[in-house]
C-alpha cells in the first residue's frame, strides 16, 4: 500500500505541474476539454490492455463516446492552438489517468480508502510548494497568499471532498467507469455558464451535452 501511496504522490506532483503549465500556455476553453477527455481514455486502455480488466464492449463504446463529447467542447479552439496548447493538456490527461489507476488500486487494498486518500492528499499538499520553488514558480504561491487565500481554502476543501468520493467509488466500481463518469462534471460548468454567467448556448455545446449524456446512459445501461 505504501509503495502505491508514494507513487501516487509523485504522479500528483506531475499532474499539478503540467496542469499549471497548461493554463499558463493556453486558455481554459482549450486546455480543459483536452486534459479531462484524455484521462478516461488512458485509464480505460491501460486497464484493458495491461491490467486484465474486462469491460462490456458497449461500456467501452460509451466511454469513448463520452470522451468525444468532452473533446468536442473545445473544437472551435483547436485549430487556433499551437503545439504547447495541445501537448501540455495531453500530458496532464496522462497523469490524470495514471493517478486514477494508482489511487484506485491503492484504495482497494488499504483498510480505509478515505485514509489512503487523505494521507496522500496531505503529503502532496505539503510537498507541492517546494516543487513550485524548485521549478521557479514561487510567484504562484505569492499570488495565492496576496490575492486568493479564501478561494484557495474553498478550492482545497471542495477538491478534497469531491476526490474522496471518487476514491471511495474506485472501490465499488471499475476504475475506468468511475473516471469517465467523474468527467461529466464538465456539464455542470456548461450549465453554470449558461444560467449564472449568461453565456450563450451554441450548437456545439448542445451537441456536446447530448453526446456526453448518451455516453453516461450507455455506461449505466450496460
How would you label these PLM feature ranges?
Residues 19-35, 108-115, 164-184:
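Structural motif at transmembrane-helix junctions in multi-pass transporters
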Amino acid at each position: 500500500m505504501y509503495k502505491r501511496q508514494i507513487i501516487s504522490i509523485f504522479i500528483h506532483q506531475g499532474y499539478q505541474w503540467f496542469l499549471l503549465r497548461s493554463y499558463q500556455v493556453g486558455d481554459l476553453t482549450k486546455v480543459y476539454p483536452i486534459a479531462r477527455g484524455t484521462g478516461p481514455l488512458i485509464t480505460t486502455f491501460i486497464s484493458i490492455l495491461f491490467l486484465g480488466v474486462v469491460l462490456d464492449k458497449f461500456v467501452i463504446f460509451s466511454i469513448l463516446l463520452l470522451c468525444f463529447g468532452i473533446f468536442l467542447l473545445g473544437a472551435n479552439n483547436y485549430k487556433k492552438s499551437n503545439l504547447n496548447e495541445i501537448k501540455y493538456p495531453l500530458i496532464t490527461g496522462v497523469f490524470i489517468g495514471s493517478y486514477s489507476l494508482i489511487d484506485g488500486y491503492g484504495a482497494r487494498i488499504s483498510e480505509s480508502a478515505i485514509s489512503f486518500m487523505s494521507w496522500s492528499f496531505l503529503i502532496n499538499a505539503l510537498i507541492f510548494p517546494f516543487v513550485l520553488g524548485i521549478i521557479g514558480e514561487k510567484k504562484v504561491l505569492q499570488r495565492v497568499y496576496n490575492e486568493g487565500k479564501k478561494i484557495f481554502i474553498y478550492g482545497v476543501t471542495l477538491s478534497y471532498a469531491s476526490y474522496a468520493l471518487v476514491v471511495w467509488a474506485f472501490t465499488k466500481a471499475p476504475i475506468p467507469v468511475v473516471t469517465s463518469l467523474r468527467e461529466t462534471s464538465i456539464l455542470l460548468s456548461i450549465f453554470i455558464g449558461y444560467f449564472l454567467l449568461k453565456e450563450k448556448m451554441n450548437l456545439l455545446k448542445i451537441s456536446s451535452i447530448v453526446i456526453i449524456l448518451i455516453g453516461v446512459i450507455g455506461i449505466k445501461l450496460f
